[in-house]
Amino acid sequence: MIVMDGSMGNELLTRRSDLVTGLWSAQYLIDAPELVKEIHLDYINAGADLIITNTYSTIPSYLSKQNAEDKMPELIHLAGKLAREAVEDSKKKVIVAGSLPPLEESYRPDLVINKKEAVPIYETLIKELTPYVDIFICETMSSIKEMQHVIQALSLIHI
């Protein structure tokens, strides 16, 4: 049995509600990265065998709300690094999963973007997270089409 961590976004909001912007949980990577790492550690210390990177909102649909699309690779990289550091600091054997989120709203298959737009975004997520993660998780995807975009990106990277 593997126990996965819980919500990162809700924990961030509970601990520091002053940082809420259109970037959602990505804002904390900019303004409070130590808090992101602390939450990963808290989940590990609570018994999680697997933690998920804080990359759910490090995608253009969120970043564009604050004109921060250019920060995408940097934020993804930082999110992976913080998760891996939390595992190393814990000195426990914990799996790090790279979050590959839906690229528009969760649970809205009608909003899934086309492959030509989606695959490069997933390629960036995968490339930046690969040094830090053990596995990838297609998080809250609402259609097979979204997962196929991830599979296409993975096949192009050859990891």
PLM regions: where:
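N-terminal small/glycine-rich loop or linker at the start of catalytic domains
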Residues: 1-31, 56-63, 92-117
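Conserved, mostly hydrophobic/aromatic
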Residues: 6, 43, 83, 136
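Glycine-rich, proline-tolerant flexible connector loops at the mouths of alpha/beta enzymes
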Residues: 24-31, 44-46, 50-75, 135-147
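Non-catalytic positions within long, well-ordered alpha-helices that form the structural scaffold/packing
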Residues: 44, 129-130
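Active-site beta->alpha loop and helix N-cap motifs at the rims of alpha/beta catalytic domains
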Residues: 50, 72-76, 80-128
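Conserved small/polar residues in nucleotide/adenosyl-binding loops
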Residues: 157-159
